[in-house]
């Protein structure tokens, strides 16, 4: 049998294309080199907790059509992302808002906060020449030093003075007490995890796992009229122009025999000395409850570090 489409990768993009193609009456084969569907949004159940295997993913969109589409497969919870920044034991709200400014400077009104930021931004004159100058021109020296500099340098493995200014086009500054990281109208986490969402989207579609497309390209290309490839583009072209400078990360998992480690789904570590950039405590994506609504006695952590 020759398929209309061979879709390489079973992440959100691949699953969406596959589902829509099948709906349009096309024949589809989905392959993935991993032993599971879901790509980088894959979740697995550990100790009753849906663990985000490849880092945290919070679904958010302003597009009602998109929201209606994903919620037609599974229900979503009401999770909103409100990360915390930890700078050497000092805790700050993210994104930068009035809670952040009050902790940083003791200001209590939006007018005071705006004046403080404007005062510190004056340090930079002219066009910012690097990321450090760009960040200071947006939020001032204090916030840059505690909440931007170390975190960014860990992520990129370079001094902020050696990074281009365009990496930080803008830094969201809110003169309100709104801790919601995203401004999107619709946001949440699929109840039961992202893997459940992908499995629902791929119902009735042939899926082959543990298949490496690039190692079997010539043979696999014969199976379909068209190929839709969703993997790394430099790998597809066999690195003929070199490798792209992806920001790569390393994940380390830990299970603790305690109900609560940090009290929040995401805590960013913004000092340069702490080796990891973020700790994810997965249970708080679903409010610390299992699928039956019971409190979970253990907790699962994901340490994210630059590799």
Where are these regions (language model features)?
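Glycine-rich FAD pyrophosphate-binding loop
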Residues: 23-44
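A conserved beta-strand/loop capping segment in the N-terminal third of enzymes
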Residues: 42-51, 59-110
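Active-site/ligand-binding neighborhood in enzyme catalytic cores
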Residues: 85-92, 98-226, 230-237
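A glycine-rich beta-turn/hairpin centered on an aromatic-Pro dipeptide
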Residues: 264-267, 276-286
């Amino acid at each position: 049998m020759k398929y209309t489409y061979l879709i390489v990768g079973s992440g959100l993009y691949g699953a969406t294309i596959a589902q829509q193609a099948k709906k349009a009456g096309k024949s589809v084969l989905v392959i993935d080199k991993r032993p599971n569907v879901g790509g980088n949004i894959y979740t697995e159940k550990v100790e009753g907790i849906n663990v985000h295997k490849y880092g945290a993913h919070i679904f958010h969109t302003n597009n009602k059509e998109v929201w209606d589409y994903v919620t037609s497969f599974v229900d979503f919870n009401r999770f909103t992302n409100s990360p915390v920044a930890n700078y050497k034991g000092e805790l700050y709200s993210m994104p930068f808002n009035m809670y952040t400014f009050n902790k940083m400077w003791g200001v209590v009104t939006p007018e005071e906060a705006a004046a403080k930021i404007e005062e510190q931004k004056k340090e930079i004159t002219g066009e910012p020449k690097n990321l450090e100058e760009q960040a200071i021109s947006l939020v001032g020296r204090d916030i840059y030093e505690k909440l931007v500099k170390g975190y960014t340098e860990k992520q990129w493995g370079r001094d902020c003075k050696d990074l281009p200014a365009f990496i930080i086009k803008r830094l969201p500054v809110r003169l309100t007490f709104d801790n919601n990281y995203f401004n999107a109208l619709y946001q949440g986490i699929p109840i039961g995890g992202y893997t459940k969402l992908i499995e629902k989207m791929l119902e009735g579609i042939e899926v082959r796992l543990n298949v490496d497309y690039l190692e079997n390209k010539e043979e696999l290309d014969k199976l379909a009229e068209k190929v839709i490839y969703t993997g790394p583009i430099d790998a597809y072209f066999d690195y003929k122009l070199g490798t792209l400078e992806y920001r790569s990360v390393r994940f380390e998992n830990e299970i603790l025999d305690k109900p609560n480690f940090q009290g929040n789904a995401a805590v960013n570590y913004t000092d340069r000395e702490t080796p990891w950039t973020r700790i994810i405590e997965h249970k708080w994506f679903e409010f610390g409850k299992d699928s039956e609504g019971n409190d979970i006695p253990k907790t699962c952590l994901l340490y994210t570090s630059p590799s």
